[in-house]
Amino acid sequence: MANIKSQIKRNKTNEKARLRNKSVKSSLKTAIRKAREAAAAGDVEKATEFQRVASRELDKAVSKGVIHKNQAANKKSALAQKVGALKG
């Protein structure tokens, strides 16, 4: 346990941020999984919709500082490839 007052405060804010980041990451994983599963099932319409939702979630996570923008770009690109393969 920290003895310094400022470090005690930092520990509290770090814990709040950890929980917030955990929530964002969890919803992000769910959105990506739904898009992947729809693409695997061959449902073009659902896959397209879920891809759009996942892209939005990824962008939000980047703006909140939860993930790096390059990681989001890679994930969006991979999803787009899977959905594009269904369409094309």
Swiss-Prot record:
Residues 1-30 are annotated as: Disordered. GO terms for molecular function: small ribosomal subunit rRNA binding; structural constituent of ribosome. Keywords: Ribonucleoprotein, Ribosomal protein, RNA-binding, rRNA-binding. GO terms for cellular component: cytosol; small ribosomal subunit. Pfam families: Ribosomal_S20p. Binds directly to 16S ribosomal RNA. Belongs to the bacterial ribosomal protein bS20 family. This is Small ribosomal subunit protein bS20. It comes from Streptomyces coelicolor (strain ATCC BAA-471 / A3(2) / M145).
